[in-house]
Amino acid sequence: VENRRRFLAEAAGSSAATLVTLRQIHSGMIRVVEADDLERPGGLQTADGRAMLRGDGLMTDVPGVMLGVQTADCVPVLVADVKRRAVAAFHAGWRGTLKRIVERGIGMMRLRYGSRPEDLLAAVGPAIGPCCYSVGEEVRYEFESQFAYADELFSEVYDSDPVRDKYPLLFLTARAPGHSNIGPQIHLDLWEANRRQLLDAGIPAKRVTVVGECTACAVYGDRKKYFSHRGESGFTGRMMSVVGVANRFA
């Protein structure tokens, strides 16, 4: 609890700000936070401080509310309407990206708050990059069925083995009958996939910032810079990305 107060004081300039988070479920579900939600006993948290809302997107126009999404490889996307004072936060793994959670979220902001894409600022935060994010063929198939530009999101990466590269015939004959050669890994660019959704929603490219740092391999000095579920084999923490509406008189 004390750590959360310090975080709010740093991010919002006031520990009195209200932080709203989600029980993230890798969905396309987006929840709207209204002033009435915060007036209920306990607000949007359980007695032990856990998030009550399930989903992977949040939006609000309530002053003093901070929206947070937690990631450790998935993509955090933050959006702010600087004219209508509304914000949104999205947690986009490959499933949420496939469900167009970011693109749909911008549409919801337009309907609910009257947001215009040209007034929005968006940030695609640190996430696992195309350098490290290998996926199965079934994921590529799913994206190809949904996005006309899917080919631009995938690359094929071959492992380099000096011995195998020098003596390829040795490795061919060593494989059991019926087994093919070692094929390439398929890598997915979630940064670009979510940037494209922001552009498709009408936000000008110059108003979209992509941090472009990979959570699995970025370093700071001699240490890993970010938590990474894949880079740390599932034993890791979580980062929180936050956006909110400032209290005019704070």
What are the residue ranges of the model-derived segments?
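Active-site microenvironment for binding and transforming phosphate-containing groups
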Residues: V1-A250
